[in-house]
């Protein structure tokens, strides 16, 4: 019995110490309350609506009054004649965004870190962050101005240089859609996504760079032997999170660039799970069908998250948990 008394006292002392720290940091702790409330209201409470996917939901009878239909809506989604095309578009667009959008913030963060003048660095940081705060409605308007056949900037420049004789229909040609969509996404998100890598780079000790410089390493070599290895943990974590969103190909950007889904020519390469759910499920008031498609997407994303996290833990001992 006596052998356990010191452990109990130690545990009690730790609890008191932790409680004391919590009370001292109560103002800091309270700052997370709004975020927790938002997550609770918009992420966890709506999970109760998952049962709609297994019912033939009717607005008049409500969730509890609607009859159970099992996997009927999942079967309808998988057997839809557009399912293969939708999955292809979703995966291709997501992979293109991952291939070009994932390394771009890392490269930008490294380049910004190489700017010695702090004032110039902050200026370029601000310039690169700004696109993130521009609405997709505005971005779509900018793309129309740039790529329109009727007086579009790109067509005007190409024709003035003699590269083309007639204006190209960029906005209604399926061959250009993926390029335009991915380019716009990379431009819009790169600066903001670079923040986490800039923060990680700022935590690297300057002594490492000084020691490398004394050993004759150039600035370019220092990037590969110091900067990138030191932020590899952050790189892997961000990659895991990106892989877990493999079926989130986009919604508002695609919807705006396809004229609210009315451009049938583009929909053959633009229709993804989210736009399909909006068009077939929400607009047609097939709420159970839309929920089933959303549940399918969420399950696949969770599986990808678990797989990516497990592979990362085995290969590099870096994981989310």
Language-model features, listed with the residues they occupy:
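Short, Lys/Arg-rich, polar N-terminal cytosolic tail immediately upstream
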Residues: 1-22
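A structural signal for multi-pass alpha-helical bundles of membrane permease subunits
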Residues: 24-321
């Amino acid at each position: 019995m006596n052998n356990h008394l010191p452990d109990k006292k130690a545990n009690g002392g730790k609890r008191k110490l932790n409680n004391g720290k919590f009370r001292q940091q109560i103002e800091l702790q309270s700052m997370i309350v709004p975020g927790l409330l938002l997550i609770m209201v918009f992420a966890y409470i709506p999970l109760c609506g998952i049962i709609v996917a297994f019912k033939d939901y009717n607005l008049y009878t409500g969730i509890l009054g609607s009859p159970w239909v099992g996997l009927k809506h999942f079967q309808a989604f998988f057997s839809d004649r557009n399912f293969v095309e939708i999955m292809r578009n979703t995966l291709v667009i997501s992979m293109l965004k991952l291939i070009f959008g994932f390394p771009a913030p890392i490269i930008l963060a490294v380049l910004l870190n190489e700017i010695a003048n702090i004032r110039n660095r902050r200026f370029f940081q601000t310039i690169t962050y700004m696109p993130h705060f521009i609405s997709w409605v505005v971005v779509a308007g900018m793309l129309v101005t740039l790529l329109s056949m009727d007086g579009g900037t790109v067509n005007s420049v190409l024709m003035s240089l003699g590269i083309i004789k007639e204006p190209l229909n960029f906005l209604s040609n399926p061959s250009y859609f993926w390029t335009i969509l991915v380019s716009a996404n990379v431009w819009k998100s790169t600066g903001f996504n670079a923040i986490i890598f800039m923060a990680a780079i700022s935590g690297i000790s300057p002594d490492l760079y000084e020691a490398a410089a004394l050993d004759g390493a150039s600035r370019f070599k220092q990037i590969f032997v110091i900067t990138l290895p030191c932020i590899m943990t952050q790189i892997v974590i961000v990659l895991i999170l990106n892989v877990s969103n493999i079926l989130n190909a986009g919604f508002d950007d695609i919807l705006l660039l396809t004229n609210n889904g009315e451009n049938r020519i583009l929909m053959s390469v633009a229709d993804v799970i989210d736009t399909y759910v909006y068009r077939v499920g929400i607009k047609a008031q097939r709420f159970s069908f839309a929920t089933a498609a959303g549940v399918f997407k969420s399950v696949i994303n969770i599986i990808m998250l678990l797989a990516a996290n497990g592979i990362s833990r085995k290969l590099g001992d870096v994981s989310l948990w």
